[in-house]
Design a protein with these regions (language model features):
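Non-transmembrane, aqueous-exposed alpha-helical and coiled segments at domain scale
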Residues: 1-125
Length: 125
């Protein structure tokens, strides 16, 4: 059994999604192990655009297991909307597994972040 790991070193803008989509064609599983919904890439299949933020691109293949792992930061609203969007385009996401140890971002987390940034005033990063 062999494994292929796609790892980025340019703050997420180096085109990992396109490479993973290509490699997913021959993979048994596509696993996302970290990151959140600030990521994103577009995959085009049969002239249909699929915009992915949290879901692994393997969801476009019925015979692949797709995993959102322990280190993924999941905003439930975002992942549910993304699944609904896939369903509207005829993609069945029942091949998706979400770790029970994945991190969950709730609205109060986002509000706390906003308040902390506001409190920094001119000293923001």
């Amino acid at each position: 059994m062999s494994s292929v790991v796609v790892l980025g070193a340019q703050w997420g803008d180096e085109g990992k999604g396109k490479i993973v989509d290509y490699l997913a064609q021959k993979a048994d599983a596509v696993v996302r192990y970290s990151g959140g919904s600030n990521a994103g890439h577009t995959v085009v299949v049969n002239n249909i655009n699929y915009k992915l933020r949290l879901l692994p691109s393997g969801v476009l293949f019925n015979d692949k297991t797709n995993v959102l792992g322990n280190g993924v930061v999941i905003n439930p609203g975002v992942v549910l909307a993304e699944i609904a969007g896939m369903k509207e385009k005829g993609i069945d996401c029942s091949n998706l597994v979400i770790s029970d140890r994945a991190h969950v971002v709730l609205p109060y987390h986002q509000r706390l972040d906003e308040l902390q940034e506001e409190a920094l005033g001119n000293h923001k990063i």
